[in-house]
Amino acid sequence: MTAANPASTPNPESAPRSRELFDRALAVTPGGVNSPVRAFHSVGGTPRFMVRGEGTYLWDADDNRYVDLVSSWGPMINGHAHPDVVRAVRQAAAGGLSFGTPGVGEIDLAAEIIDRVGPVEQVRLVNSGTEATMSAVRLARGFTGRRKVVKFAGCYHGHVDALLASAGSGVATLGLPTTPGVTGAQAADTIVLPYNDLDAVRRTFAEYGDEIACVITEAAAGNMGAIAPAPGFNGGLREITSSAGALLVMDEVMTGFRVSAAGWFGIDGVAGDLYTFGKVMSGGLPAAAFGGRADVMERLAPSGPVYQAGTLAGNPVAVAAGLANLRAATPEVYAALDRNAERLGELLGSALSAEGVPHQVAFAGNLVSVFFSEDPVRDYAGAQAQQSWRFPPFFHALLERGIYPPPSAFEAWFVNAAMDDAAFDAIAEALPHAAKAAAAATEPGAGA
């Protein structure tokens, strides 16, 4: 079945195979999934087990077709199964899956990243965004000789113990303030501040400035929903950290090479000392990177004393996928991403306004979010204050009509360049039903 010949429109009873697979998964995997947000915990119902993707569409195990607004949580800017990426993966895999030695592709991918992001002078490849942020923080501590790290509430930097306090993404979806298993000692040197609050940063540096190794921030927040940095926020972080001798770590795992060819740096031009990347640069395979100033990066082993390693880092197949994905992302692709995000936002706003549903359609570049709120959302407290109980019926009304949005009120929506008029027609047809469902939702406990 091709994108031009869709499967039947999903409905609540149309996913028996997914239900069967989920029951099997529950017996062998905690919660039935390998990443919590996939479990539909906050929206209820049966997670869809996807078996195929093409362009802007996904097909589940019951052969239902969906317009995909998750894009594998970001990597698929060119759409699923892009011919250039598939060709590169096949060619690389035919030559061998892993060697445990240096490879030519590692050099090419690192050079591509360096060419795109001006402040990045050297790159180290790793296997996941979590490894990238963990390694960047370790390197910042090793370079500065300091211990404390400043992060922002609602920003998610992978499941690094010291950075899970007041985190976004799956932690926010599950409503956890942090997570069991992270000890007080592991988080003792982590300072959590409100996002977009430079005054709080200044006060913290006034008290602890000579103890702070780095500030780590999402270049634009996407893990509590899409929240752009306030004008001057990233620039203010740059000034404060530079004055105090601390490093600025820009987490661009989500925004990198998605919101522009140079990531968020291509939008605001604020230079970090270190960067973390993933998602788009992986092409959908397990790969990530961190990089930055050469004098900082050269502190890594074997050049320097800060240890970091990975058996599968620089895997030739993953590197080939990432390089092909980046090279397929032409200026026309980035123009399409921006255009598609704007079009999606207009459809969301129009449908919700027609039903009188309190909402904010928010953008961080071409990341999109819907907050069920009367007021603009600029930080984690604002995201948490939304009427998130409206989201589950909104989500399921879309899912039942062949639209696959993120299954959480605290995640960004990801467009791709393969979206066409047919995809937007399907979204436009489904959204009025979803808006009505959101309008009819009642707050748990209301009237009790």
UniProtKB/Swiss-Prot annotation:
SUPFAM superfamilies: PLP-dependent transferases (SSF53383)
A single BP term in Gene Ontology: protoporphyrinogen IX biosynthetic process
Sequence positions bearing N6-(pyridoxal phosphate)lysine: 279
Pathway terms, separated by semicolons: Porphyrin-containing compound metabolism; protoporphyrin-IX biosynthesis; 5-aminolevulinate from L-glutamyl-tRNA(Glu): step 2/2
Reaction(s) this enzyme catalyzes, per UniProt: (S)-4-amino-5-oxopentanoate = 5-aminolevulinate
Superkingdom of the organism of origin: Bacteria
GO cellular component, one term: cytoplasm
Pfam families the UniProt entry points to: Aminotran_3
Keywords per UniProt: Cytoplasm, Isomerase, Porphyrin biosynthesis, Pyridoxal phosphate
Gene3D superfamilies in alphabetical order: Aspartate Aminotransferase, domain 1, Type I PLP-dependent aspartate aminotransferase-like (Major domain)
Molecular function GO terms recorded: glutamate-1-semialdehyde 2,1-aminomutase activity; pyridoxal phosphate binding; transaminase activity
Cofactor(s) the record lists: pyridoxal 5'-phosphate
Enzyme class, spelled out: isomerase
Primary residence: cytoplasm
Entry's EC annotation: 5.4.3.8
Subcellular location as annotated: Cytoplasm
PROSITE patterns (UniProt xref): AA_TRANSFER_CLASS_3 (PS00600)
Oligomer status and interactors: Homodimer.
Family, similarity comment: Belongs to the class-III pyridoxal-phosphate-dependent aminotransferase family. HemL subfamily.
Annotated protein name in UniProt: Glutamate-1-semialdehyde 2,1-aminomutase
